[in-house]
């Protein structure tokens, strides 16, 4: 089937300002949005800024908002749109714009550095460490994260209230805290970090982060809610409080 033109409405501009611009771009069968953006760069807009790397849905670089929804450009097929539909591509909203479709995501790296790394306890007497298979599988789900930061982008706590960024780590890094906190071999206590510095209390479990995750990680159900339960048990459970009073610990 020969390529047919599609209308691509792409954001052009930088931190000082910009606007959407329409382009007619040929799109062949099997193309994804990133293919069309590359075609646009090659034929009409060579200065269009766009971040990408693997084009296989594994690096998380090509995050954008496509028709208003945070998605990976390399995993969004053109045949999912209606014939004649205008496809709007804009930069992810939550982070400062650098230029065109590229944003400054350094906030995420700053939050990552605030989380203490994996800290294993002493080995068993025979020199090994053992884990139950269910514990292995639980943390494996969280490690599927490709750090596309779509969950960070869609989270209304920082999307609509950028002033919360200093005190809220966002779903990606709360999930990282949960992963380490649930690891049976880790001895570092991160519950106070989750409560006080990472801003777990800001999360009201709307599940928007789970809905946009390209790796289909159950961020809310398997990470955020269990982490909230652990924080509440540790800090507010009357039985835990009584036990501390009696034992002095």
Task: Label the predicted regions.
Residues 62, 82-83, 211:
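Extracellular/mature segments of secreted proteins
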């Amino acid at each position: 089937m020969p390529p047919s033109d599609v209308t691509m409405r792409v954001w052009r501009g930088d931190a000082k300002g910009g606007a959407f611009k329409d382009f007619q771009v040929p799109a062949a069968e099997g193309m994804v949005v990133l293919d069309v953006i590359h075609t646009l760069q090659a034929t009409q807009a060579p200065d269009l800024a766009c971040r990408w790397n693997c084009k296989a849905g594994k690096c998380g670089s090509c995050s954008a908002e496509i028709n208003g929804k945070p998605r990976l450009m390399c995993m969004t097929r053109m045949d999912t749109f209606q014939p004649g539909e205008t496809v709007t591509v804009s930069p992810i909203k939550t982070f400062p714009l650098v230029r065109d479709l590229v944003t400054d995501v350094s906030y995420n790296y700053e939050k990552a550095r605030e989380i203490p790394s994996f800290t294993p306890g002493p080995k068993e007497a025979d020199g090994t460490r053992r884990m139950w298979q269910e514990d292995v599988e639980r943390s494996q789900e969280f490690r599927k994260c490709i750090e596309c930061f779509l969950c960070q982008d869609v989270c209304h706590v920082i999307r609509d209230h950028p002033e919360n960024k200093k005190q809220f780590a966002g779903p990606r890094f709360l999930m990282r805290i949960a992963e380490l906190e649930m690891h049976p071999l880790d001895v570092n206590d991160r519950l106070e970090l989750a409560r006080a510095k990472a801003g777990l209390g800001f999360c009201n479990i709307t599940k928007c982060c789970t809905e946009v995750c390209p790796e289909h990680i159950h961020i809310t159900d398997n990470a955020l809610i269990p982490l909230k339960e652990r924080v509440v048990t540790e800090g507010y459970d009357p039985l835990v409080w009584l036990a501390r009073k009696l034992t002095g610990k």
